[in-house]
């Protein structure tokens, strides 16, 4: 049985949720897309400042997941995620559970955006207790808290 389904999300338009209970460490869905070079991403206006669907594979390549067939692109960011992104082979990216996930729970992961990456353009609506209001990787949230005195 497929582990996920597309839903209307309270976080951001659409999302994915668990269709069954999912165990921690279970692979849920492969993040699929087109392999492009960093140079292509820098030169193509499609990418501009919107890095939402790009994953770095290595020093030369990125994976552009902004395609209809890639349902994993619908997984939203959360400051308290239940999934993580694993790049096990430098060519395939998997979304994997980091804890047990209950049926009908929305799937989420930390997008890992840098504090220096126009964070004000990426507002977070996850609603978790530790949300800082912007999509910033966990290791950089202290910088934002210090800047805005949270």
Across the structure, where does each feature detected by a protein language model lie?
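Catalytic cores of histone-lysine modification enzymes
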Residues: 1-86
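C-terminal SET catalytic tail plus cysteine-rich post-SET Zn-binding segment of SAM-dependent SET-domain
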Residues: 79-150
